[in-house]
A protein has these predicted regions:
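Charged, non-catalytic interaction/linker regions at domain boundaries
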Residues: 1-164, 233, 241, 246-272
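Extended catalytic cores and adjacent scaffolds of nucleotide/polyanion-binding enzymes
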Residues: 191-195, 214, 256, 260-262
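Short runs of predominantly hydrophobic/aromatic residues within well-ordered alpha helices
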Residues: 146-149, 162-169, 173, 205, ...
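Residue-level recognition of alpha-helical structural elements
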Residues: 145, 161-165, 184, 201-205, ...
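Charged/polar positions within long, soluble alpha-helices
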Residues: 181, 214-224, 249-257
Length: 273
């Protein structure tokens, strides 16, 4: 069976190094580095993998090259959700089968690349590996919809434009809902309930989500008043970021063990509990 080795550019804390159920986060061996570099050489690319580079190793992946970008996105998304500062960046992907590297792909640098990232306090190797597994399970269950959730959240996290960031974050969160619920009121109320918030906290959360959706709607329709709402939202982007991470984490954990229809029923039930 194939395994994907996604090589990082950022320093992964040693407390997150480990292996569980075929998943691993660890430094590449000398033999693995040579195998990846040889595969690049075979493609006419004299690329070097720095000594000590760490890889996220994902088991049971398909060998189809068209699926590699989705693997990169889901790992970048998984890291972004549990990151406190910085944004994860990756150097290369190697697909290994029976100990041999069969495919490689270089990952270009981004302006948002961060050499150092801090992760949430208390996160362990086991916790990170289980989170990666859950993200991949949700991806298999949701297919294209999970790609929208992950891709748009990553774009939000990397965006240098407040307008683009707000649009991408809102689309990421919209993908959690059924198309019939994508109106401002239901968007804010449904997602606020996903957090388990009650009373004043739920009201405050719903108001913030409503402002997010209103900004997205105004931007999409070219409303001149969008700039005023963006100025209002800009200082609250860190709060929106934390809230979105909480909502999306709940979504991924639920969908890794349930169907999309069960998720819709769960949201509906939460409105009356």
């Amino acid at each position: 069976m194939n395994a994907a080795y996604i090589v990082t550019r950022f320093a992964v804390p040693e407390r997150l190094h480990g292996a569980e159920s075929g998943f691993a986060i660890r430094p590449l061996s000398v033999a693995e580095v040579v195998a990846i570099e040889d595969q690049f050489h075979g493609q006419g690319d004299e690329r070097r993998i720095p000594a000590g580079s760490v890889a996220f190793i994902l088991p049971d992946v398909l060998a189809d090259p068209s699926g590699i970008p989705d693997l990169i996105t889901i790992v970048e998304f998984a890291c972004s959700i549990v990151a406190v500062t910085g944004h994860p960046s990756f150097l290369a992907v190697g697909i290994f089968s029976q100990g041999a590297c069969r495919q490689v792909r270089h990952i270009p640098r981004s302006t948002s690349d961060s050499p150092d990232i801090s992760f949430i306090k208390g996160l362990t190797a086991s916790g990170m590996l289980q989170w990666l597994r859950r993200c991949l399970q949700a991806q298999r269950s949701l297919k294209d919809r999970m790609h929208i959730t992950a891709n748009r959240f990553v774009r939000f996290a990397k965006s240098e434009s407040i307008a683009d960031a707000i649009m991408d974050l809102c689309i990421s969160l919209e993908s959690l809902l059924d198309h019939q619920t994508e109106v401002s009121f239901r968007f804010s109320i449904c997602l606020a309930r996903v957090t388990g918030a009650r009373g004043d906290e739920a009201e405050t959360t719903a108001a913030l989500l409503s402002d997010l959706y209103d900004a997205r709607s105004k931007l999409a329709h070219g409303d001149p008043s969008a700039s005023r709402l963006l100025r209002k939202l800009e200082p609250r982007v860190p709060q929106l970021n934390a809230l979105a991470k909480e909502i999306i984490t709940t979504y991924v954990l639920f969908l890794s063990d349930h169907t999309r229809d069960e998720w819709k029923a769960h949201i509906h039930k939460s409105l009356y509990s």
